[in-house]
């Protein structure tokens, strides 16, 4: 009968409950064996892949994300800033115009109220 690694681990867990230290020792012995086992080969491949992912792929992904963010957000805002900066000085004039219109509306409302009051009193 051929036993796989997972079958061995399951057997160890079932036969030796509450012996996590011994299980850790056996797993460490299997994985760090000086003889090239499938488990040690797989572990080595995982470590190599992790190094490649962190050192190469993650940097490329960050660069791609930075470029995408810059093209979608920063560049349009800079364009709008350059386009509308000349109009920024006009906001003070607009504020003054709005204040004058507001004042005129209040005067008209007061005049209307006075006219209405005079009509009702006659």
UniProtKB/Swiss-Prot annotation:
GO terms for cellular component: endosome. The modification Phosphoserine is found at residue 33. It comes from the Eukaryota. It is found in: Endosome. The keyword Translocase does not apply. Keywords: Endosome, Phosphoprotein, Transport. The keyword ATP-binding does not apply. Component of the biogenesis of lysosome-related organelles complex-1 (BLOC-1), a complex involved in endosomal cargo sorting. Belongs to the BLOC1S1 family. Component of the biogenesis of lysosome-related organelles complex-1 (BLOC-1) composed of at least BLI1, BLS1, CNL1, KXD1, SNN1 and VAB2. This is Biogenesis of lysosome-related organelles complex 1 subunit BLS1.
